[in-house]
Amino acid sequence: MRSSLLLGLTVVLLLGVTVPPCMAGQALNKLMPKIVSAIIYMIGQPNAGVTFLGHQCLVESTRQPDGFYTAKMWCTSWTSDNPIVGEGRSRVELEALKGSIRNFVQTASDYKKFTIEEVEDWIASY
């Protein structure tokens, strides 16, 4: 009886340790469209600049000779210790920009540069 109790507690502890990252990933996936929309909106504003979670960022796109657009997003002041560059590529410039934003945000999340709560607060204040 004791061994089954210990086994049950071990399973509960293992599940408790492994579930939160999955839930954080799901939460980020749900927030991603709002993050991308907010940053795309900033790009469209004259002289506004892009600010993500209080950090100045650059988002740019370039049309390649093959007709595709490549886009990049980075925030040098925020990730200077470990540079993160989000990249996107598409025949449509807007889709390349969106891809670079998603890639940047996902990579920054993987490096634990922010919490889901910080992103939720940023979206709410925007």
Swiss-Prot record:
Classification via Pfam families: Anti-LPS-SCYG
Record keyword Secreted present: yes
GO cellular component, one term: extracellular region
Subcellular location: Secreted
Signal peptide: 1-24
Keyword field: Antibiotic, Antimicrobial, Secreted, Signal
Main localization, broad class: secreted
Entry coiled-coil feature ranges: none
Gene Ontology biological-process entries: defense response to Gram-negative bacterium; defense response to Gram-positive bacterium
Tissue: Strongly expressed in gills, hemocytes and reproductive tract, with weaker expression in muscle, heart and digestive tract. Not detected in eyes and hepatopancreas (at protein level).
Function: Has antibacterial activity against the Gram-positive bacteria E.coli (MIC<50 ug/ml) and P.aeruginosa (MIC<25 ug/ml), and the Gram-negative bacteria S.aureus (MIC<100 ug/ml) and S.pyogenes (MIC<50 ug/ml).
UniProt protein name: Antimicrobial protein 1
Gene: AP
